[in-house]
Amino acid sequence: MPRSRINGNFIDKTSSIVANILLRIIPTTSGEKEAFTYYRDGMSAQSEGNYAEALQNYYEAMRLEIDPYDRSYILYNIGLIHTSNGEHTKALEYYFRALERNPFLPQAFNNMAVICHYRGEQAIRQGDSEIAEAWFDQAAEYWKQAIALTPGNYIEAHNWLKITRRFE
């Protein structure tokens, strides 16, 4: 049984009903509909912390989905799961792949910046200030891209860029 039919959350049920109606009225292929169902079930599992199930659904959605824009969101969500699991190298790979298909994902740039900033802080704790600065510089570049796409968002990142004199 698809996850969308067993979820007990009222908002999720409402979203599922709306999504099902849209799938019926918008002209799409059966493959696109099936891909969306897997994507939606992946999001549901992910929101409940069932990352293994979410990944299975996302991988199946990737197999079926042909639209690069839609694939970018699947890849982004896979990146989120790897970030949550502390698998930062894998997460960065998926964020890059998402941005290759859709360069207008500020949230991917932000998450990449957060990972780079975290790695910079790790380098400081290990006493390697040169490596830390390189990670911080990379974080700054990603945050600048996120801010350029959505001015007014990422206020903390914007302040960090100003404080560290990395904002141009």
Swiss-Prot record:
UniProt keyword list: Chloroplast, Membrane, Photosynthesis, Plastid, Repeat, Thylakoid, TPR repeat
Role noted for this protein: Essential for the assembly of the photosystem I (PSI) complex. May act as a chaperone-like factor to guide the assembly of the PSI subunits.
Family: Belongs to the Ycf3 family.
Bilayer topology annotation: Peripheral membrane protein
Principal cellular location given in the protein's record: plastid
Gene Ontology BP annotations: photosynthesis
Entry GO terms, CC: chloroplast thylakoid membrane
Entry-linked PROSITE patterns: TPR, TPR_REGION
Annotated protein name in UniProt: Photosystem I assembly protein Ycf3
Gene name in the database record: ycf3
Organism domain of life: Eukaryota
TPR repeat residue intervals: 35-68, 72-105, 120-153
Compartmental location: Plastid, Chloroplast thylakoid membrane
SUPFAM superfamilies: TPR-like (SSF48452)
